[in-house]
């Protein structure tokens, strides 16, 4: 399922590594020099050759072996330096970096992020509150991935209201869970971090565009906030209100450096096995000259060992990918056709529909419902009692795998059931369990209404009296008592089921 909607709009800001990646050609050169040196030195073992040429071959071979060892030592030093190096986010490089820094501070020192909206802050608070009740503390630290990449990629989408950017970059994510006894779980993964950023509002639409006041949380037109919030009187500039991160999520990176290293090790081990299997019998057979045995063994190891090693590593990798953590419950064909099915369903009703934004919204709704101790109070959740297992989940990582189970219309209401794939961390009796889960979610949305810009579940806008209130904690407007129907503003969850 591609994350891109329009390849021509994609831009990237490359990130420079202060400590360069180890040079692979240095390693290859060391191996080649060592192999040729060993081959040259082995000529000295041939009894039928004159001693003078034999000594020359021995000296040349020794020199090549020394040169190869020096190259391998230099490569080893580069590997050591690169292992010790950790890339860092750059403040004010972009809002992507700024929010990444704020997110790290949120987990290690409880400093509230300033670059995100109220809904994103609310989900982070839900997660932290649940862990606090369980006596768990999570330390999450992200840093730019330690390899050559495109850097921060931006996919912009301009609407009549503002511009929405989907920004993402590969990150090294260090997760650590602690309780009163110390660290009880630790894991380092390579993920892709996604941020949805709203910026550059259309000034002609400021009176119709609602936004949560960064100071008091009330919903007001953006134009009113620039003149002074009607509730707290704080005056904001447009630069104070935008840009704003409206969604954040992580997706596990399957083609990670760790997997590449495993494939390389598998290939290397297979080549070594082929080399030893060919050389040892030839060496024991005194009739075969050692140079001939070495040359034949090198050839077999390089060709046969390399090919078989690569095939074996691919088979192991693919088997793990399609069978691990519940992945087998996501049929491949359904997976690759999901984006087209969802876009086709929304095409007649929403000309501004973006699958990337939709995917991010669904991820947030699921996380909010599962992280909430009282999901029945959420205006976005209208289902029954959730699986008790959900109450133990303390961290969720979406695996960028979603399939359509059902799509149909009920009057003007679009109803769909999706299957989503997650890696969840749960706490039970003081221990952390990591497992893959497939979660089916049934959604409903009234297509007769367009989703308003700046829509926030934590600060909803009453269509009857115009007041703003927190729809997370109550379904009725506290001022006029009108029932709030969130399906007229966005999606609601009707069912959430663990598969």
Region annotations inferred by a language model:
Residues 76-140, 235, 325-397, 463-464, ...:
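Core segments of small alpha/beta cavity-forming domains
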């Amino acid at each position: 399922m591609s994350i891109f909607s329009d390849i021509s709009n994609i831009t990237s800001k490359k990130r420079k590594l202060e400590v360069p990646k180890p040079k692979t050609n240095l390693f290859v050169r060391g191996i080649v020099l060592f192999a040729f040196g060993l081959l040259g030195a082995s000529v000295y073992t041939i009894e039928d050759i004159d001693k003078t040429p034999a000594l020359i071959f021995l000296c040349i071979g020794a020199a090549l072996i020394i040169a190869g060892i020096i190259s391998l030592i230099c490569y080893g030093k580069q590997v050591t330096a690169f292992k010790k190096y950790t890339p860092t986010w750059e403040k004010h490089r972009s809002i992507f970096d700024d929010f990444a820094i704020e997110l790290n501070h949120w987990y290690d020192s409880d400093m509230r992020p300033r670059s995100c909206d109220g809904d994103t802050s609310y989900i982070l608070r839900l997660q932290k509150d649940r862990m606090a009740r369980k006596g768990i503390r999570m330390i999450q630290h992200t840093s730019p991935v330690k390899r050559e990449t495109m850097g921060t990629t931006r996919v912009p989408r301009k609407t009549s209201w503002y511009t929405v950017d989907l920004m993402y970059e590969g990150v090294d994510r260090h997760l650590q869970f602690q309780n009163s006894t110390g660290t009880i779980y630790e894991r380092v993964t390579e993920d892709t971090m996604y941020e949805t950023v709203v910026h550059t509002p259309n000034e002609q639409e400021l009176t119709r565009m609602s936004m949560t006041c960064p100071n008091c949380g009330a919903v007001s037109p953006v134009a009113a906030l620039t003149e002074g919030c009607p509730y707290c009187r704080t005056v904001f500039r447009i630069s104070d209100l935008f840009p704003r991160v409206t969604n954040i999520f992580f997706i596990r990176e399957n083609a990670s450096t760790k997997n590449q290293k495993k494939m390389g090790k598998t290939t290397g081990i297979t080549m070594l096995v082929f080399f030893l299997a060919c050389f040892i019998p030839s060496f024991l057979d005194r009739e075969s000259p050692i140079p001939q045995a070495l040359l034949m063994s090198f050839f077999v190891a390089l060709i046969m060992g390399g090919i078989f090693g690569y095939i074996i590593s691919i088979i192991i990798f693919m088997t793990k990918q399609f069978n691990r953590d519940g992945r087998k419950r996501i049929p491949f064909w359904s997976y690759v056709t999901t984006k087209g099915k969802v876009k086709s369903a929304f095409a007649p009703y929403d000309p501004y529909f973006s699958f990337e934004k939709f995917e991010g919204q669904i991820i947030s709704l699921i996380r909010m419902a599962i992280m909430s101790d009282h999901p029945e109070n959420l205006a976005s959740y209208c289902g029954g009692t959730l699986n008790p297992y959900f109450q133990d989940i303390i961290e969720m990582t979406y695996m960028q795998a979603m399939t359509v189970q059902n799509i149909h219309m009920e009057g003007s209401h679009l109803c769909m059931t999706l299957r989503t794939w997650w890696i969840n961390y749960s706490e039970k009796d003081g221990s952390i369990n990591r497992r893959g889960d497939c979660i089916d979610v049934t959604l409903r949305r009234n297509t007769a209404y367009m989703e308003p810009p700046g829509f926030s579940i934590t600060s909803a806008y009453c269509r009857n009296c115009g007041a703003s209130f927190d729809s997370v904690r109550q379904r009725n407007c506290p001022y006029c008592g009108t029932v709030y129907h969130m399906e007229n503003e966005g999606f609601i969850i009707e069912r959430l089921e663990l598969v």
